[in-house]
Amino acid sequence: GAGSGCHTLALQEMGKEVTAIDISPLSVEAMNKRGVKDARLQNFFDKSLTGPFDTILLLMNGSGIIGKQENLPAFFHRLKEVLARDGQLLLDSSDLSYLFEDEDGNLDIAPEDDYFGEIDFRMQYKSIKGDSFDWLYIDFNTLNLYARQAGFKAEKIEEGEHYDYLARITHL
């Protein structure tokens, strides 16, 4: 989600109309206190979120909200519902396949294993533990495959030094 609203505030300062969503009530409260004009307690998959939006930002490993590889078709279906026909999704993620490379550079992943980018997170601060949740880091080739199957074009527009990338997704 939009978290504390830092990207939203920067876009507002540039005169953009921005809708910021997050599933955390505390994040929405923080955004409101910081001056975000349209901060909503909402999930991307919630049907009450309606578009069309000309740009959707999923930054800071934003692919995580998809949760699991098996959710990619539902994600792209939802994207079709809310993204304007000439709109774009900007998404960044990290390719975790390097964690499974053997000494020869081959991937050491059994076919029956879950997708290597599926992570089960649980946040903890001192003695306070949150519930666990699914988070998806997706390599660009897999993202591109699912995007094309759903009628979208994925372009890698920036590549970082730590197996991370920024992608732009548009309707075909």
Q: How would you name each of these model-derived features?
A:
Residues 4-15:
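Conserved SAM-binding loop of SAM-dependent methyltransferases across substrates and taxa
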Residues 72-85:
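A short glycine-rich, Lys/Arg-flanked "PGG" loop and its adjoining helix->strand segment in the class I
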